Design a protein with these regions (language model features):
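C-terminal functional modules
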Residues: 97-158
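Flexible, glycine-rich surface segments
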Residues: 2-115
Length: 158
């Protein structure tokens, strides 16, 4: 992969400023090659995510049921993270238990029927810094979860 019309280069499609700021040598050959080195690409993308506050083991995107006031969401929750405990007080419910002080943003994804609501944590935000499309970021999460599930079941190969 040489580049895109937008100027992104290499396998990871880094724009020039991201290449300058986040690309790293992942294979130890003392040079950065995002055009041919898979190790450099993986290390560079990991560096990008880490520098955008990726938190190992933190939730990415939680499926939720909600009756939250849309006006409150548009005024507060889209501009800054809201603690999970506050979401729960406002009527958001989800399976599982998570740190009540962890901050999340609420997103509604349009479907053919009703919107699907998701609480997005810090790791989802880190992905949206790599590509600002919410749909792209959601696809990354769902693919990664599928790979992880396959690895856990022994049905996926690295």
């Amino acid at each position: 992969v040489k580049g895109s019309a937008a100027g992104a280069v290499g396998m990871g499609q880094f724009i020039p400023t991201s290449y300058r700021d986040f690309a790293v040598d992942g294979d130890g050959d003392e040079r950065i090659d995002l055009f041919h080195s898979k190790a450099d690409n993986i290390a560079s993308i990991a560096n990008y995510l880490a520098r955008h506050n990726w938190r190992k083991g933190a939730p990415w995107l939680l499926v939720v049921d909600t009756e939250v006031d849309p006006l409150w969401v548009s005024k507060k929750a889209k501009r800054q993270g809201v603690e999970l405990a506050e979401w729960q007080r406002r009527g958001v419910s989800m399976p599982g238990s998570y740190d009540p002080e962890a901050e999340f943003n609420l997103y509604a994804f349009s479907t053919e029927k009703d919107p699907e609501y998701r609480l997005a944590g810090a790791n989802f935000y880190a992905i949206t810094r790599y590509n600002h499309s919410l749909w792209y970021s959601r696809a990354v999460v769902e693919i990664a979860q599928g790979i992880a599930q396959g690895m856990a079941q022994g049905t996926a190969q690295p």
